[in-house]
């Protein structure tokens, strides 16, 4: 392991809650519906993040907890039953309904697990109900997906059939390219979790080899291990380096030689390196500060330093699972400073004192930092953009070169007021 400096920090934090993950999960599984049991604030958050107007009837919604519910003056369970009945009647195409806990439902101790159990009996054979928490008390941002996948694992049947299981939501076109490469390598039985249809859950067992596509799935990994799955240790497929090591790790697990892997991915690497050059010219030597939000920060830091030659000031991450991130940490330069958790005021002081060229942060911090003359990039864009794989390396670098390029254009000469 490289000589990395680890620090843990606690205090006030500035991150999205786990409800945000509904935005990409509902697109991934079009036969599922995500019902948040929460406040109007929860509803506004998801609707704004998804960019979908509610009259478009998206596959998510919020059962609003009113003041009388929070005060214990009404039976929230009865009201939730009514909402679910109306929803199923209105949307008969729903096959899986996720009951998603929020801060308000956690505060009043609403037992969504029991609610889901009762609803499963009532709607047996029609709709499947599962529950998880997206509460900001318990989760941050991407951990919502971890909770959703963990909730589905008990529903997955057992099988000893050998297969490669890609775990973590990917853009469909990226996933299709990955599967094509694996088939060219000779791995024919490949499935994904979450699947594209919520009712088509993969079967798992002792011959299931799990390859993670996202670094924020600690609980999911633990439960898959308990089901006997073998977890392949690898960096994550961000950039040329990470994706190459990711493919090599999968090939090794299936006893496929490295030469075969390089033969198949070499043309992709050659094209990606050429496409990366223009972004590298802008990013090279620039100082980068990553604030914690998505748990992608360590992988992004590795890519931006090793392939784009940026200098790392500090790499923040909401949580750090050293087992899952071991291969990533090994690729970081010596003396990289990784800070787990957050005390937002202290971290902002370090940002100002270090004079970075670019700060990767949440939307809530971006505008104030921009007002201070500090260039920023929203971390949420990394989750909503198709950034995985060798052939996406230039697009990934472009997300970071764009704000720096913008600043080069918006000089004091172009910002003259009349």
Swiss-Prot record:
It catalyses: chlorophyllide a + oxidized 2[4Fe-4S]-[ferredoxin] + 2 ADP + 2 phosphate = protochlorophyllide a + reduced 2[4Fe-4S]-[ferredoxin] + 2 ATP + 2 H2O. [4Fe-4S] cluster binds at residues 17, 42, 103. Pathway: Porphyrin-containing compound metabolism; chlorophyll biosynthesis (light-independent). One of its GO terms (biological process) is photosynthesis, dark reaction. InterPro entries: LIPOR_BchN/ChlN, Nase/OxRdtase_comp1, Protochl_reductN. It is an enzyme of class 1 (oxidoreductase). SUPFAM superfamilies: Helical backbone' metal receptor. GO terms for molecular function: 4 iron, 4 sulfur cluster binding; ATP binding; metal ion binding; oxidoreductase activity, acting on iron-sulfur proteins as donors; oxidoreductase activity, acting on the CH-CH group of donors, iron-sulfur protein as acceptor. Its EC number is 1.3.7.7. Keywords: 4Fe-4S, ATP-binding, Chlorophyll biosynthesis, Iron, Iron-sulfur, Metal-binding, Nucleotide-binding, Oxidoreductase, Photosynthesis. Binds 1 [4Fe-4S] cluster per heterodimer. The cluster is bound at the heterodimer interface by residues from both subunits. Its cofactor is [4Fe-4S] cluster. It comes from the Bacteria. Pfam families: Oxidored_nitro. Protochlorophyllide reductase is composed of three subunits; ChlL, ChlN and ChlB. Forms a heterotetramer of two ChlB and two ChlN subunits. Belongs to the BchN/ChlN family. Component of the dark-operative protochlorophyllide reductase (DPOR) that uses Mg-ATP and reduced ferredoxin to reduce ring D of protochlorophyllide (Pchlide) to form chlorophyllide a (Chlide). This reaction is light-independent. The NB-protein (ChlN-ChlB) is the catalytic component of the complex. This is Light-independent protochlorophyllide reductase subunit N. The lineage of its organism: Bacteria, Bacillati, Cyanobacteriota, Cyanophyceae, Synechococcales.
